[in-house]
């Protein structure tokens, strides 16, 4: 079997981002708060004392939060809160990233460690944990739960010390400060920050990805909110009952041991912890299209352009954590923030309580993946099963289990696989591809000599274009035929070996049959 693959690409010149019905800034959704009947199913939880600015300093909350035109915590309020915590706690270090948002806003983050470690020089034999919120700017419980976690750690010094015996933690509470300013989902340029993890179209995505890559976490979480009022059923009179939806990374190119650790240890514990807090949960889902009258819900998918899977492809445990909040402004905000806090704390506590199992499983998984000769997975499918999903009737607030068809990705089933190449060859005319790979943490060796020899290549036999722009490109579906040929490439070409930790990110970026790829034309040899 020939082990090298040639990447010779032709640009399609697809033009710039086009997004319908969006303006520059303030792309805000309409607000539809819960009725009094529905709100009764989401009461305040007794004994809740959240240690974040929206709750400890309610006078700082902008008026617009009550009508869904603003979040609860301005940048300067958040930064002041973080700085005060860092001044009062030697194990908390306040940092500002050496890059800015698209509109020039800062990225403050906290580094928590009981030693003198840093992002570039982390503690040895400890877990590295990355926690982020505020990816979508109109999901305020995401970043607020991260601030509440910082406040909770400062208020519970013994618990913090117990955690930091076993881990270093980086908290980036606000991934998308421009989106938070405009209270909109998107970046300032109207790209979705959670759909840019393979294309890396925006510099902001690349900058944050490089920080993530330098830290190289064992565990990561991504805090979001989901739409509260979406209705289902023949009468459109039922909604999700859950306070929290969550999902591990699902891409099949993540080491199986790491995926099983996520599902069998972390996910099970998280569900129990949510229930113990008096809250409700279900797996993260989206609605699918079905030819039957039965509701089809799709479990979180495997797509690498989503942050959860992109982070997981660096061979780490990752969870998307969503709380019920989009579209209801400030309603139930304490309960929403608590839901996010409970999930984040559950992940940290599970890791510490099972430190040896977690650390050793992830480290073994990294080594196993790096040295693997198993096939790589390019496409997959989600088997459909029957199950129930927690719903709430909006007419009387009754809670019940609703029968659905469920497209599961725990696990997904591989459809198209390919033998794992020893390396990829990239001509010197494509340095931008190499720069993208380097952002992923993938090393590319520049060859001082010309390459002459056999390669395995893909001949593109058909290309079907989608009918509209998506995130700045026209997406395509391609068919290919595997060919072997001899090639000659000049000195200065790049060799990307696949026996490295982050090679799965090269697979999803370079293999022509995966999603969200590089441009090709029919009859290209790739």
UniProtKB/Swiss-Prot annotation:
Primary localization: secreted
Protein transport listed as a keyword: no
Residues bearing carbohydrate: 46, 116, 393, 459
Binding site for Zn(2+): 136, 139, 224
SUPFAM superfamilies, per database record: Zn-dependent exopeptidases (SSF53187)
Lineage: Eukaryota, Fungi, Dikarya, Ascomycota, Pezizomycotina
InterPro entries per record: Peptidase_M14
PANTHER family, alphabetized: INACTIVE METALLOCARBOXYPEPTIDASE ECM14, PROTEASE FAMILY M14 CARBOXYPEPTIDASE A,B
Residue ranges of every copy of the Peptidase M14 domain listed in the record: 71-351
Enzyme active site: 322
CC terms in the record's Gene Ontology section: extracellular region
GO biological process: proteolysis
Cytoplasm listed as a keyword: no
Signal peptide as annotated in the record: 1-21
Protein known as: Probable carboxypeptidase 2
Family: Belongs to the peptidase M14 family.
């Amino acid at each position: 079997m020939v082990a090298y693959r040639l990447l010779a690409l032709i640009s399609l010149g697809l033009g710039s981002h086009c997004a319908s019905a969006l303006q520059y800034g303030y792309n805000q959704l309409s607000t539809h708060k819960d009725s009094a009947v529905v709100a009764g199913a989401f009461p305040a939880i007794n004994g809740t004392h959240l240690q974040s600015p929206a709750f400890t300093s309610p006078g700082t909350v902008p008026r617009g939060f009550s009508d869904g035109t603003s979040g609860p915590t301005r940048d300067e309020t958040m930064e002041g809160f973080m700085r005060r915590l860092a001044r009062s706690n030697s194990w908390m270090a306040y940092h500002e990233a050496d890059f800015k948002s698209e509109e020039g806003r800062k990225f403050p983050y906290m580094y928590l460690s009981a030693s003198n470690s840093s992002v570039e020089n982390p503690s040895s034999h400890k877990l590295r944990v990355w926690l982020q919120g505020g990816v979508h700017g109109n999901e305020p419980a995401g970043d607020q739960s991260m601030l509440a976690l910082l406040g909770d750690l400062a208020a519970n010094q013994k618990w913090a010390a117990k955690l930091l015996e076993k881990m270093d933690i980086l908290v980036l509470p606000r991934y998308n400060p421009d989106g938070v300013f405009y209270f909109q989902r998107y970046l300032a340029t109207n790209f979705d920050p959670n759909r840019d993890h393979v294309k890396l179209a925006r510099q902001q995505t690349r900058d944050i990805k490089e920080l993530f890559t330098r830290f190289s976490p064992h565990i990561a979480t991504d805090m979001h909110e989901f739409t509260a009022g979406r209705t289902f059923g023949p009468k459109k009179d039922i909604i999700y009952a859950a306070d929290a939806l969550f999902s591990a990374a699902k891409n099949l190119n993540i080491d199986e041991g790491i995926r099983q650790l996520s599902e069998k240890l972390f996910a099970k514990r998280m569900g129990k912890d949510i229930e113990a807090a008096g809250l409700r949960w279900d797996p993260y889902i989206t609605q699918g299209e079905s030819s039957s009258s039965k509701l089809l819900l799709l479990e979180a998918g495997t797509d690498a352009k989503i942050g959860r899977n992109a982070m997981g492809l660096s061979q780490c445990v990752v969870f998307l954590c969503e709380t019920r909040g989009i579209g209801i402004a400030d309603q139930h905000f304490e309960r929403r923030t608590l839901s996010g806090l409970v999930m984040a704390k559950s992940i940290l506590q599970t890791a510490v309580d099972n430190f040896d199992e977690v650390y050793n499983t992830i480290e073994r998984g990294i080594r196993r993946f790096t040295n693997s000769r198993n096939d790589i997975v390019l496409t997959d499918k989600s088997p459909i099963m029957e199950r129930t999903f927690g719903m709430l009737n909006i007419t009387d607030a009754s809670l019940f289990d609703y029968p659905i068809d469920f497209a599961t990705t725990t696990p997904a089933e591989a459809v198209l696989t390919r033998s794992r190449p020893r390396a990829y060859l990239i001509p010197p005319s494509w340095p931008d591809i190499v720069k993208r790979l380097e952002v992923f943490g993938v090393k590319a060796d520049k060859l001082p000599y010309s390459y002459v020899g056999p390669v395995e290549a893909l001949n593109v036999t058909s290309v079907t274009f989608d009918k509209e722009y998506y995130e700045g490109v026209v997406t395509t579906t391609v068919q290919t035929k595997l060919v072997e040929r001899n090639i000659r490439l000049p000195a200065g070409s790049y060799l990307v070996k696949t026996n490295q930790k982050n090679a799965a990110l090269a697979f999803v970026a370079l293999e022509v049959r995966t999603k969200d790829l590089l441009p090709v034309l029919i009859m290209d040899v790739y």
